[in-house]
Amino acid sequence: MEETVAIGCVVKLDRGFPLVRLEDGAELRCKHATSLVKGERVRAVIGDRVRVSFAERNDKALIVEVLPRTRELVRKDPTERAVPQVLAANFDRIIVTQPSVEVNMRRLERELVLAHETGAAVSVVLTKADLAESEDEVERVRERVRALVGADV
């Protein structure tokens, strides 16, 4: 049986198994090659471009290489104090959402710091405006958020 190697993009993570969409549109459930996760613990995240190897006899393709990233959204790994955790890669814009009736300004600040560190364009979207008591209330919240983040709300 022949093995095929292709380039694709991670579009979903499901219980640690990336779903990779190939350039021809086909999707493959994958696992990471042992060589990737030993030592440096490089794991593909949503948005990563990866090289996969697959054979018809296997139920999962194998991610053999994570291609260089243009951007990363990184946070401290909650399980290990010193190790950063990459959440997403290779994006142009980050959209931070908060419900307009319950904006948590401290959380929004933390999310915006992480987002701005990537160098990507950042937007804030306030959701659930229909649950507010009045349009004036929504406008007051929008102004508070705009004072924090700028005009793109």
Regions found by a protein language model. Give the residues of each.
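Short, well-ordered coil/turn elements that cap or connect secondary structure elements
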Residues: 25, 58, 117, 148-150
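Residue-level signal for inorganic ion chemistry
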Residues: 47, 115, 127
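Canonical P-loop GTPase G-domain recognition
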Residues: 121, 130-153
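Short, glycine/serine-rich, charged loops/turns that create anion-binding
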Residues: 101, 129-130
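Histidine-anchored nucleotide/phosphate-binding helix
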Residues: 107-121
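Short, glycine/charged-enriched secondary-structure capping and boundary segments
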Residues: 24-26, 78-79, 109-112, 138-141
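N-terminal accessory targeting/assembly segments
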Residues: 1-105
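Structural beta-sheet core signal
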Residues: 96, 124-126
